[in-house]
Regions:
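Flexible "arm" and connector segments at domain edges
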Residues: 1-70, 74-106
Length: 106
């Protein structure tokens, strides 16, 4: 799927469940929750968890968790962006332009 198609699918999915009704302050909380889960997945992938109460995951399972948590972050970010009429493509283009302008050699 292309990014625009993915964003539309996420928006439709979230709308069907009433999840788009949450305001931006609640949505940013969900985004931060998912960012924390991504941080935990990165840690597990890089150095492991060392938790006797958890099953030790394979590197492939850890990689899959990274992918899923990145998707959760992007999903929440896309829904938040949509509240302001912004697409992820818009945000990435603005980010690219900002970096080029900031770091271009003169």
């Amino acid at each position: 799927m292309q990014m625009a198609e993915t964003e539309q699918w996420m928006k439709d999915f979230y709308e069907k469940r009433g999840w788009t009704e949450y305001g931006p302050f609640i949505r940013i909380g969900f985004l931060m929750e998912e960012a924390g889960e991504l941080a935990r997945a990165v840690r597990a992938y890089e150095i492991g968890r060392d938790r006797p109460d958890e099953k030790d995951a394979t590197q492939a399972e850890r990689r899959q968790e990274l992918i899923e948590e990145m998707g959760d972050v992007l999903g929440n970010l896309a829904i938040l962006a949509d509240k302001y009429g912004i697409t992820l493509e818009d945000a990435m283009k603005a980010h690219q332009e900002k970096l080029i302008k900031r770091f271009e050699t003169k």
